[in-house]
Amino acid sequence: MASLSDPAVREFLTRGTRTGKLGYLAASGRPLVTPVWFIVEADSLVFNTGKDTAKGRALARDPRASLCVDLEEPPFGFVQVQGEAELSEDPAELLRTATAIAARYMGAERAEEFGKRNGVPGELVVRLRPVKVLAVFDMTG
């Protein structure tokens, strides 16, 4: 089984601006998937979401989630992280993570702007702590 400490997994997850597809459960038990911007920090995948969004409410109710990141061109591949979400509303952590995520996806020149917009009260920092990591880097061979 792969892990987030594996350099190949980390390189795959952090390359460019690949979007994660977050899987979680609605209150009815129905599976849902939504795109998220994320960063890798230590042993977790980290993203922000609103406390009162479907994602925020669902993860507060049931922290089980999975996040899949894929390569949509040859040689095709993916990393799937299954785990438990930990939620934080700490203002300093919100601003720091929102700014880091913005730097990855919007560029350093707009990081502060988007960090201030997204790192505000009512938002959550979500840390997906892996229970299982699956990785396939070349699906053509």
Task: Cite the ranges covered by each PLM segment.
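Hydrophobic alpha-helical segments typical of transmembrane helices
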Residues: 5-9, 55, 97
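A short beta-turn/loop motif at secondary-structure boundaries
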Residues: 28-30, 73-75, 116-120
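Short beta-strand segments
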Residues: 18-51, 59, 65-69, 78-80
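Alpha-helix boundary recognition
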Residues: 13-15, 60-61, 119
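Extreme N-terminal tail/first-helix region
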Residues: 1-16, 75
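Glycine-rich nucleotide phosphate-binding loop and flanking beta-alpha elements
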Residues: 46, 53, 132-134
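Short, surface-exposed beta-strand-loop junctions and turns on beta-sheet-rich folds
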Residues: 53-55, 74
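Charged, gly/pro-rich active-site loop segments
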Residues: 1-4, 78-141
